[in-house]
């Protein structure tokens, strides 16, 4: 502990430092519970600045005599042979810069509370003829009187500090010294013109603008560029958001005047209505943006069924306004618009003005992405529900099921008011729609008529290529089943389970009659789940999203039970004994056989491998022999519909599955960017491995990174859905169960990314920040792929090859995508070389049985 004149401090308790001094947290020697701030100034550093130090001490003593609540008080000044110590009161809340770093932006209640106190402090020093000349968030200290970790803003007291650049100005005297921080300097100061105390008013306006929007009103990469901007711009107009209240808008415009003579006077500033009048309710930022955005004003926002309402960002007070805010994530997924021939097209609204990083364009006239493959019932638009389209080969079966259910509900409500009763087959509706419906009634949207489907707004991305022109990686790699628990990075990357259906009506009826005789160890046939499906709440969310790929079903009312328990998949976990024979998945394969232990054998896709055409079997996979006896009355395996379809159909389906897998990875990357701890850890890893860290962990920067990733995902999804629509219209892609499932997944992911992008855009981005210019989706994808390879290499090094398979597979997929999309031949060569290196590692893992290669 260093001691002097009744005070002590430790050099480890550093609070901050400046050009001439270091500030420590100290205390009284005889009162150790009373903290103080000790500014230690080494005499060797002030040999040429003694006058500056003397002036600061004089100003601090002058202001301390006022004992003003909003000015940092000087407790004692002590000189030793080596140092000059200024002992000042300690502020336990940090400074405004730290507060803004945590909160990003402040609501107007908080801004008003802070600016009133700043005005009181400024009024006090102005009466003494003092101009601060270095007002910035770092010199505005906060005192937390509540002693709580997260105090309410009304418990925070503002104190002005650091009068090192302050000076006395007599009436009418102008200064011409260049000092202060360039971003907060008044134009007359940075242009080396004479200035007076009104320079502090400009700094106050800049600080208020930053509190409101999270960025400075005028930004340049260097001080000379900012100076040049001020010199050539005669009329400075800050871009104040529309949701700003009139009083605050007026105050900002009057503070941020280029000419000091036109700037608001101190008297008018101290008595401005924003400081003296209670705040009037102002429109929410999100409501105003919703009103002018064509996507929010003229469309129903549809959230994925599995997504939760968008939470409020941690640490942000922007949404704390008492005015009601319309949450984007609250609209139910089943709300869809029924298109009628007489309905006018929505008029496009004004484009988003605050965020220029991307623009939502109107639908293209020549083509549009396909809507989710579902029929729309002929009920009112507000009560529209979605029904799955039956597989063409199963329409007769589906119709018989509906007739049997209708006969069992003779005493129930009429089918016209029942969601289930209205879900007749697409074929049945097509036969009777002209006789039953007038020309002006809503028409049923069928997959055979893609031109009638509602059009989705398309996101254009000049850096990304269309999915149609993308080639599939050859080979693709599939991670084999393992009893090892997946790592957190791969928690949401569980492979899809096999979804099959009976081949014909006889199989379906037989399944109903023989349900009680089926052996749970050999039953694998499933169809899309209904309300009677077994509870899956215990399954992790990521596993649920990937393992159940059936299209989402509408809610079934209690008075309309469906007799489809026979289509449920028997849970292997509930089997009293594990099978002793190889676990059989119909016409499919496994990487291992089940043992007599209680471990669960994970299903693998062979005929419907992700990204594979479905006609090839992986090496080491074992196809179910046709002559295997079906014990315990089990049904013979049904023929997979994808086998009999054309090769082009299989290739397109494989490409759609590849996009779904890739978008899952992009969403995972974007969610990682939302976690400040994960970003800080990534920056730390980069510092340890390369010696330098280029990762920016600020909240606006992370939001910008999330936004570009979500926009890239939106483009890929839009392109994939457009590809599907075109090929469905040309009868190349058939509406099979697998196609419906993957299109439903793509549709859900599209709405999830769209809602999240709009949420991020509504928070605002510092568009003039030069750090934002280097953000790109390709850079983020490349960095993530390299990090996956590094983590996988460490897993191999420490003898955990079972953990690295998924990481290598994901990196292989992302490197292939980047190599397909880049335009630079040199970049493509580097990416291809890295991809080949990862492929070699996967080949080694293939020989060890951890992955299986499939030629596409």
From Swiss-Prot:
Residues under site feature: Required for interaction with lgg-1: 357
Positions with biased composition (Low complexity): 411-436
GO process annotations (BP): apoptotic cell clearance; autophagosome assembly; autophagy; axon extension; axon guidance; axonogenesis; cell migration; dauer larval development
Entry keyword set: ATP-binding, Developmental protein, Differentiation, Kinase, Magnesium, Metal-binding, Neurogenesis, Nucleotide-binding, Serine/threonine-protein kinase, Transferase
Protein's recorded name: Serine/threonine-protein kinase unc-51
Residue ranges annotated for the Protein kinase domain, each copy included: 9-275
GO molecular function, one term: protein serine kinase activity
Cofactor section: Mg(2+)
Region of interest called Required for interaction with unc-14 and vab-8, as start-end residue ranges on this chain: 750-856
Binding residue positions for ATP: 15-23, 39
Changes seen on gene knockout: Worms exhibit various abnormalities in axonal elongation and axonal structures. RNAi-mediated knockdown causes abnormalities in constitutive dauer formation in daf-2 e1370 mutant including a lack of autophagosome formation.
Keyword Nucleotide-binding: yes
């Amino acid at each position: 502990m260093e001691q002097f004149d009744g005070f002590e401090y430790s050099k480890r308790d550093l609070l901050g430092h400046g050009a001439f001094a270091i500030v420590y947290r100290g205390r009284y020697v005889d009162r150790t519970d009373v903290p103080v701030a000790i500014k230690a100034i080494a005499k060797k550093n002030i040999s040429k600045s003694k006058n500056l130090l003397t002036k600061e001490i004089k100003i601090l003593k002058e202001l301390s005599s006022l004992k003003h609540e909003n000015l940092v008080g000087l407790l004692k000044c002590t000189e030793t042979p080596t140092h000059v110590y200024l002992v000042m009161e300690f502020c336990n809340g940090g400074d405004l810069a730290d507060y803004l770093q945590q909160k990003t932006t402040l609501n107007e209640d908080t801004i008003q509370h802070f600016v009133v106190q700043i005005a009181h402090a400024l009024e006090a020093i102005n009466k003494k003829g003092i101009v601060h000349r270095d007002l910035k968030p770092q010199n505005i200290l906060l005192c937390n009187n509540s002693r709580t970790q997260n105090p309410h803003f009304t418990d925070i007291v503002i104190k002005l500090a650091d009068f090192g650049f302050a000076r006395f100005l007599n009436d009418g005297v102008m200064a011409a010294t260049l000092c202060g921080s360039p971003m907060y300097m008044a134009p007359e100061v940075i242009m080396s013109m004479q200035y007076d105390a009104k320079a502090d008013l400009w700094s106050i306006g800049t600080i208020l603008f930053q509190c409101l929007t999270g960025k400075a009103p005028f930004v340049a990469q260097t001080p000379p560029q900012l100076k040049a901007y001020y010199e050539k711009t005669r009329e400075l107009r800050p871009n104040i958001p529309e949701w700003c209240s009139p009083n605050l808008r007026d105050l900002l415009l009057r503070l941020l005047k280029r000419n000091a003579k036109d700037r608001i006077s101190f008297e008018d500033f101290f008595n401005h209505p924003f400081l003296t009048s209670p705040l009037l309710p102002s429109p929410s930022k999100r409501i105003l943006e919703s009103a002018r955005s064509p996507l929010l004003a003229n469309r129903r926002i549809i959230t994925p069924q599995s997504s939760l309402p968008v939470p409020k960002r941690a640490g942000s007070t922007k949404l704390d306004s008492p005015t009601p805010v319309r949450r984007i994530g609250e609209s139910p997924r089943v709300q869809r618009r029924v298109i009628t021939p007489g309905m006018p097209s929505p008029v496009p609204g004004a484009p988003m003005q605050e965020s220029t990083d991307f623009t939502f364009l109107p639908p293209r006239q020549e083509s549009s992405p396909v809507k989710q493959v579902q029929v729309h019932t002929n009920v009112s638009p507000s009560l529209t529900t979605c029904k799955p389209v039956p597989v063409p080969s199963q329409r007769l079966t589906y119709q018989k099921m509906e007739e049997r259910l209708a006969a069992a509900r003779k005493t129930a409500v009429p089918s016209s008011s029942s969601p289930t009763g209205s879900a007749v087959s697409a074929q049945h509706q097509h036969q009777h729609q002209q006789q039953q419906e007038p020309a002006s009634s809503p028409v049923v949207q069928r997959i055979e008529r893609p031109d009638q489907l509602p059009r989705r707004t398309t996101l254009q991305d000049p850096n990304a290529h269309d999915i149609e022109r993308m080639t599939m990686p050859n080979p693709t790699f599939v991670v084999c089943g393992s009893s090892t628990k997946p790592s957190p990075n791969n928690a949401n990357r569980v492979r899809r389970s096999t979804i099959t259906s009976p081949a014909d009506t006889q199989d379906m009826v037989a399944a109903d009659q023989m349900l009680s005789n089926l052996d749970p160890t050999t039953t694998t046939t499933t169809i899309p789940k209904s309300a009677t499906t077994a509870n899956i709440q215990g399954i992790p969310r990521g596993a649920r999203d990937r393992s159940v790929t059936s299209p989402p079903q509408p809610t079934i009312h209690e008075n309309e039970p469906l007799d489809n328990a026979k289509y449920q998949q028997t849970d292997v976990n509930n089997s009293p004994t594990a099978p002793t024979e190889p676990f059989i998945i119909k016409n499919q394969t496994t990487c291992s056989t089940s043992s007599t232990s209680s471990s669960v054998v994970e299903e693998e896709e062979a005929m419907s491998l992700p990204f594979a055409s479905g006609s090839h079997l992986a090496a080491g996979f074992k196809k179910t022999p046709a002559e295997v006896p079906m014990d315990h009355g089990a049904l013979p395996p049904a023929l997979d519909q994808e086998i009999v379809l054309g090769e082009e159909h299989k290739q397109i389906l494989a490409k759609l599955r590849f996009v779904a897998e890739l978008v899952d990875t992009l969403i995972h990357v974007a969610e990682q960017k939302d976690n400040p701890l994960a970003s800080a850890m990534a920056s730390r890893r980069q510092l340890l491995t390369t010696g330098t860290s280029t990762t920016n962990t600020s909240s606006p920067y992370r939001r910008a990174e999330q936004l570009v990733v979500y926009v890239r995902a939106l483009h890929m999804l839009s392109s994939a859905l457009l590809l599907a629509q075109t090929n469905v219209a040309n009868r190349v892609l058939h509406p099979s169960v697998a196609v419906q499932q993957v299109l439903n997944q793509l549709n859900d992911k599209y709405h999830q990314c769209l809602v999240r992008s709009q949420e991020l855009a509504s928070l605002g981005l510092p568009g003039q920040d030069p750090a934002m210019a280097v953000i790109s989706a390709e850079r983020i994808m490349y960095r993530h792929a390299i990090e996956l390879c590094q983590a996988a290499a460490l897993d191999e090094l420490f003898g955990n090859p079972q953990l690295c398979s998924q990481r290598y597979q994901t990196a292989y997929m992302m490197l292939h995508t980047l190599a397909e999309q880049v335009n630079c031949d040199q970049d493509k060569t580097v990416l291809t070389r890295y991809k080949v290196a990862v492929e070699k590692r996967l080949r080694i893992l293939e020989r060890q049985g951890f992955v299986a290669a499939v030629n596409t």
